Amino acid sequence: MHSEAEESKEVATDVFNSKNLAVQAQKKILGKMVSKSIATTLIDDTSSEVLDELYRVTREYTQNKKEAEKIIKNLIKTVIKLAILYRNNQFNQDELALMEKFKKKVHQLAMTVVSFHQVDYTFDRNVLSRLLNECREMLHQIIQRHLTAKSHGRVNNVFDHFSDCEFLAALYNPFGNFKPHLQKLCDGINKMLDEENI
């Protein structure tokens, strides 16, 4: 028999927090010299809410807590590494030009995600999947000189999941279980668009 303390501990450890994860990833990447403030500036509250919702929908879809955590951890690590490279002027001119194209493509993706949610009967999983895979290819090119094969594997892990047409169809099913998640995701993405953070 479990005591109340043990049960509350189990519930507490079941909570996923992308903000804390971002701080952990930042510390691992840059070692002891880096403060928490860098990670918190890279992953703001709105981004954190979107990441938490992505975790919840991924966990519910995969029915696998470890897999969902791995996908979101890989997403956070990729975002942080990319931001560190960018902020420390590690990209050459070609990579910077590609980075600008990547930012525009991510913005287009965000607008499409929200539009497909807001306008009935416009959702096309192939369009979203294609946009996600275009982002993946650009990202691989941007980080090619800078990050390891393991990092490229993380990128693939993230995009393999989110660009999967079956996942996208489940997420956008107007009668499905994911409708509340999609609403929260789009609310967060809309806020990021308004704040020009995406």
Curated annotation (Swiss-Prot):
The keyword Metal-binding does not apply. Keywords: Apoptosis, Coiled coil, Cytoplasm. Induction: By nuclear factor-KB (NF-KB) and TNF. Induction by TNF depends upon activation of NF-KB. One of its GO terms (cellular component) is cytoplasm. Residues 49-83 form a coiled coil. One of its GO terms (biological process) is positive regulation of apoptotic process. Pfam families: DUF758. This is Tumor necrosis factor alpha-induced protein 8. It comes from Homo sapiens. The lineage of its organism: Eukaryota, Metazoa, Chordata, Craniata, Vertebrata.
